[in-house]
Amino acid sequence: MASRSAGTLLTEFNAAYVPPGLMPGYQGHVPTVAFSFGAPYGTTTLKYFQDHRNRAMEKSHTPFSQGGHFPTIFSTNPNLLLMERASTRDRWLHKPSYTRFNLDSHRSTELTNFYQMVQQHRKYYQDKTGTVPRVPYFAMPVREPERYPLPTVLPPLCPKKKWHLLRLAPENLKTYQTFPSGKRVSPQERKKRDCYFEFRA
């Protein structure tokens, strides 16, 4: 049987004959899209999707539309930011209840924790009373000797403490013994006497 796709169809009209190498294959069918000979199925459906998406995005920018006003944390519109909303119990009404499942859970947890720390830090530097604690994640680093001081490096002493230390120093202690007669005996002489009189019966 003669077939056009196999190239065995014989016709006497040259305009009706299409070579098999130039004959397009199955291009699919989109009911709502007008079919054009030069556009394949993938290009036609992609253009249909992009047109539909662009129309929806343009409509969502108007304040009278039903969609497009979803609360978010990153937006060029300050009215959509979660931080700009009222800090009352109504903020839980605007909290997004949807999640995306195509994300890395570990990275999403890190970003969520970082965002919470950012909000706490923002409350800290906006606080005028000094009652909000500082977030240690955003503390500026200090030099190592200041953060880990050596135990031998002591702060400067006040004159009162210095006087007490000098008074209790070994070289300032009384190391001699005073007898009732007024004679003073050095510890070396006492040691010799103890060695001698230790064995005395």
UniProtKB/Swiss-Prot annotation:
One of its GO terms (cellular component) is sperm flagellum. Its main location: cytoplasm. Expressed in airway epithelial cells. GO terms for biological process: flagellated sperm motility. Signal peptide: none annotated. Pfam families: CMI2B-like. The keyword Lipoprotein does not apply. Keywords: Cell projection, Cilium, Cytoplasm, Cytoskeleton, Flagellum. It is found in: Cytoplasm, Cytoskeleton, Cilium axoneme; Cytoplasm, Cytoskeleton, Flagellum axoneme. It comes from the Eukaryota. Belongs to the CIMIP2 family. Microtubule inner protein (MIP) part of the dynein-decorated doublet microtubules (DMTs) in cilia axoneme, which is required for motile cilia beating. Binds to the intra-tubulin interfaces. Microtubule inner protein component of sperm flagellar doublet microtubules. This is Ciliary microtubule inner protein 2C. It comes from Homo sapiens. The gene is CIMIP2C.
